[in-house]
Regions:
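A generic structural signal for tightly packed, nonpolar segments enriched in small/aliphatic residues
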Residues: 1-132
């Protein structure tokens, strides 16, 4: 919710994936913003009664959700690339952008549930299909 209803938060370690998502989101006026994906949030999801918990409490909720997912994705090999390259991934936080508080965001989106960031993701997939 830190970004309100204007931007979807994107957490990724991959600069190239971030660039692709940002470009697609700008083309569709379905904006996203890169957020910090840092291990500094790891203590918030580490507890005595479990290795990890899927929520770190109210502070930095999107950041702790992203660092939780990183624990399961980070280090996975992308076998399509040969060698040992890690899978590129992004966590997109839509808590704020999934619902518009007013009709002022853009011309095609009314107040209420928005379906965001579907337009950006479809454009991202379309561009990815043409480059593969």
């Amino acid at each position: 919710m830190a970004l309100g209803d204007v931007y979807s938060g994107v957490f990724t370690e991959s600069d190239s994936l971030w660039h692709q998502l940002k470009t697609a989101s700008e083309a569709e006026h379905d904006l996203c913003w890169r957020m910090p994906l840092t291990d500094m949030y790891l203590p918030q999801i580490s507890k005595l009664n479990a290795d990890l918990v899927n929520t770190g409490g109210r502070p930095a909720g999107a950041c702790t959700a992203a660092i939780f997912l990183k624990q399961f994705v980070h280090g996975l090999e992308d076998r399509t690339k040969g060698e040992e390259q890690c899978v590129q991934y992004a966590h997109i936080d839509i808590a704020g952008s999934m619902e518009a508080a007013s009709n002022t965001l853009n011309d095609y989106q009314a107040k209420g549930l928005t379906g965001r960031p579907v337009r950006a993701l479809v454009e991202f997939a379309r561009r990815l299909a043409y480059t593969s």
